[in-house]
């Protein structure tokens, strides 16, 4: 007789076919938001079919950003979508990789836990995947068991890498019973311009591949650049053996935050609720409708330059971009993000060309020396012009380096970029020295996860947060060198937030009488921003950018800036010059 240890929780699997990047993560997130708005407790999980244990050491150009959870896991960027749409924190177990699964199974084999069995993909690998899927149905820290677990299966049906995950999902349905498991398949319906036709054959083949491994989808998401006509939906329902109510047309939406409305219009949430026999209420659109009004009916527009080294792939800064937009929503403003390659800002003329028409500058996190002098140059330009600046993680470190150079430490640098610098104003954290030296594992060893900080009561950041006790997520190996605090303070830079013991600098800023808004944080506040609850630092930053834009036409004396060079010196005489007093805007 089949056992049902978790009959209270339903499982919904989301797979993809035909092509990658169809929006499985956004589809899953939007459905999760809809079910949450119906009063259900939803949690989510991403299964990634790569052999890396986590994405922490992967190239951002290949993978996009690394999303850090509260408990310190380095996860896929889709977990960020889940948190933003569900408006709740997820644990590190929300991301499962092939690397994690194989590492666990091999470790068990070495300990002799398989009692001499021949260890194979089936059943040992699939059993470990099933264990991790079913574990998501356990009660959370508050003792609440989820009503629904939505699990996104990465990759595309037909990929070799995804097969163990799909097989495990099939076995979960067999184990829990068909009435407790739902399969949602996302497929492409391409439009052929020469013939003016939408083609259903790729979707039919994708579903056939899924059925060949024992999975018949309960519903299909048809991705297209236009609505799929009813006649084609009926054809797909017939050929793929799916209820017509489960064939969902999802044309491209103006904003990702419109997707829940698109799915609701097609009645996907109602179909899922009926199919899984879930308790529910009508969708409460109060909060989401307010968000959509702010998205589509802005009162003004501001331009923010994101000065980074991975700007060719916007996914490398996905959470930063979404946090900026959310900060704009709070002000009923549209934030236009100007993607600026940091290499181009190394000189004053380069910075002026790149930043001359923006209303704020954001310096995001990153690793490695490439582009660092450009980030520092962008800060120098913005500080002299009175442009609002927000620095995140590495951004804080660049603000500190720029401040140090402005008070005579012309060779100030980070130990990360120049281990032999005479003035390492940014130093390796003591517990990271062995790792940086190459004597320990690189992956998963940074200062990761949520840490508390104490803010100075009268600081800009305390005013933004409306409290002096905060907690933010981190991902770094380097910190401000406390031996240089007094010297750096001569620039006017204030260390406005530290760890509770006062040792680690968490926030820096210039007082409002020195600059309208320059704030840096060692943390990654973008990871806690939500579209309906924007992060206070981003709200304050966008507000400062709006004020700057409003003051652009006022008569302001612009000081002349000495030409900036990568080592912080002047082209004229090779001697470092302190920056002129920054322009102040009322």
Curated annotation (Swiss-Prot):
Which residues does the annotation say bind UTP?
Answer: 20, 199-204, 235
Coiled-coil stretches are: none
Query: Mind naming one GO cellular-component term on file for this protein?
Result: cytosol
Instruction: Give the GO terms filed under biological process for this record.
Output: 'de novo' CTP biosynthetic process; CTP biosynthetic process; pyrimidine nucleobase biosynthetic process
Q: Where is this region: Amidoligase domain?
A: 1-278
> Which positions in this protein are listed as binding ATP?
21-26, 46, 78, 253
Reactions it catalyzes: UTP + L-glutamine + ATP + H2O = CTP + L-glutamate + ADP + phosphate + 2 H(+); L-glutamine + H2O = L-glutamate + NH4(+); UTP + NH4(+) + ATP = CTP + ADP + phosphate + 2 H(+)
**Alphabetized GO MF terms:** ATP binding; CTP synthase activity; glutaminase activity; identical protein binding; metal ion binding
Its UniProt pathway annotation is:
Pyrimidine metabolism; CTP biosynthesis via de novo pathway; CTP from UDP: step 2/2
The alphabetized UniProt keywords are:
ATP-binding, Glutamine amidotransferase, Ligase, Magnesium, Metal-binding, Nucleotide-binding, Pyrimidine biosynthesis
Enzyme class, first EC level, given as a word: ligase
Instruction: Tell me the function of this protein.
Output: Catalyzes the ATP-dependent amination of UTP to CTP with either L-glutamine or ammonia as the source of nitrogen. Is essential for M.tuberculosis growth in vitro and ex vivo. Regulates intracellular CTP levels through interactions with the four ribonucleotide triphosphates.
What HAMAP family does this protein map onto? PyrG (MF_01227)
Q: How does it assemble?
A: Homotetramer.
Q: What further note is attached to this protein's record? A: CTPSs have evolved a hybrid strategy for distinguishing between UTP and CTP. The overlapping regions of the product feedback inhibitory and substrate sites recognize a common feature in both compounds, the triphosphate moiety. To differentiate isosteric substrate and product pyrimidine rings, an additional pocket far from the expected kinase/ligase catalytic site, specifically recognizes the cytosine and ribose portions of the product inhibitor.
Name of the protein this chain belongs to: CTP synthase
Q: Which organism is it from?
A: Mycobacterium tuberculosis (strain ATCC 25618 / H37Rv)
């Amino acid at each position: 007789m089949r056992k049902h240890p978790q009959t209270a929780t339903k499982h919904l699997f989301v797979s993809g076919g035909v092509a990658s990047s169809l929006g499985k993560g956004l589809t899953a997130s939007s459905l999760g938001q809809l079910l949450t708005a119906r009063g259900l407790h939803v949690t989510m999980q991403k299964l990634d079919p790569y052999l890396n244990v986590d994405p922490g050491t992967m190239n951002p150009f290949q993978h996009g950003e690394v999303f850090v959870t509260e408990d310190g896991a380095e996860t896929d960027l889709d977990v960020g979508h889940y948190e933003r749409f569900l408006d709740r924190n997820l644990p590190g177990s929300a991301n499962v990789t092939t690397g994690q699964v194989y590492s666990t199974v091999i470790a068990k084999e070495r300990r002799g836990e398989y009692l001499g069995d021949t260890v194979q993909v089936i059943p040992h690998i699939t059993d470990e995947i099933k264990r991790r899927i079913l574990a998501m149905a356990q009660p959370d820290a508050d003792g609440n068991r989820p009503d629904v677990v939505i699990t996104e299966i990465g990759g595309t049906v037909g990929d070799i890498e995804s097969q163990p995950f799909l097989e495990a999902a099939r076995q979960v349905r067999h184990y829990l019973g068909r009435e407790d498991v739902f399969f949602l398949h996302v497929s492409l319906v391409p439009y052929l311009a020469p013939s003016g036709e939408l083609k259903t054959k790729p979707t039919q083949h994708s579903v056939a591949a899924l059925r060949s491994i024992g999975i018949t989808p309960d519903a299909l998401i048809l991705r297209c650049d236009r609505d799929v006509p009813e006649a084609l939906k009926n054809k797909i329902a017939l050929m793929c053996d799916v209820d017509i109510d489960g064939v969902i047309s999802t044309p491209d939406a103006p904003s990702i935050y419109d997707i829940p409305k698109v799915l609701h219009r097609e009645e996907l949430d109602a179909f899922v609720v009926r199919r899984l026999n879930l308790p529910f209420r009508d969708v409460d659109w109060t909060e989401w409708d307010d968000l959509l009004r702010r998205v589509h009916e802005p009162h003004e527009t501001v331009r923010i330059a994101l000065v980074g080294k991975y700007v060719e792939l916007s996914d490398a800064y996905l959470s930063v971009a979404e946090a900026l937009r959310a900060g704009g929503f709070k002000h009923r403003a549209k934030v236009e993000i100007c993607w600026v390659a940091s290499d181009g800002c190394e000189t004053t003329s380069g910075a002026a060309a790149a930043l001359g028409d923006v209303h704020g500058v954001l310096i995001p996190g990153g690793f490695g020396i490439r582009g660092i002098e450009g980030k520092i140059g962008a800060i120098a330009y913005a500080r002299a012009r009175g442009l609002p600046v927000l620095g995140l993680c590495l951004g804080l470190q660049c603000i500190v380096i720029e401040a140090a150079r402005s008070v005579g430490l012309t060779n100030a640098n980070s130990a990360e970029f120049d281990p032999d610098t005479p003035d390492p104003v940014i130093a390796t954290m003591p517990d990271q020295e062995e790792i940086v030296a190459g004597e320990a594992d690189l992956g998963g060893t940074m200062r990761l996860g949520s840490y508390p900080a104490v803010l100075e009561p009268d600081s800009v950041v305390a005013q933004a947060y409306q409290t002096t006790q905060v907690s933010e997520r981190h991902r770094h190996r380097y910190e401000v060198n406390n031996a240089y605090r007094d010297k750096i303070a001569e620039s006017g830079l204030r260390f406005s937030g530290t760890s509770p013991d006062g040792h680690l600098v968490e926030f820096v800023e210039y007082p409002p009488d020195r600059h309208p808004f320059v704030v840096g944080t060692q943390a990654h506040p973008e990871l806690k921003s939500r579209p309906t609850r924007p992060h206070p630092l981003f709200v304050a930053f966008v507000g400062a950018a709006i004020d700057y834009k409003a003051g652009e036409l006022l008569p302001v004396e612009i000081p002349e800036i000495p030409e900036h060079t990568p080592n912080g010196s002047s082209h004229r005489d090779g001697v470092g010059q302190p920056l002129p007093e920054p322009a102040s805007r009322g």
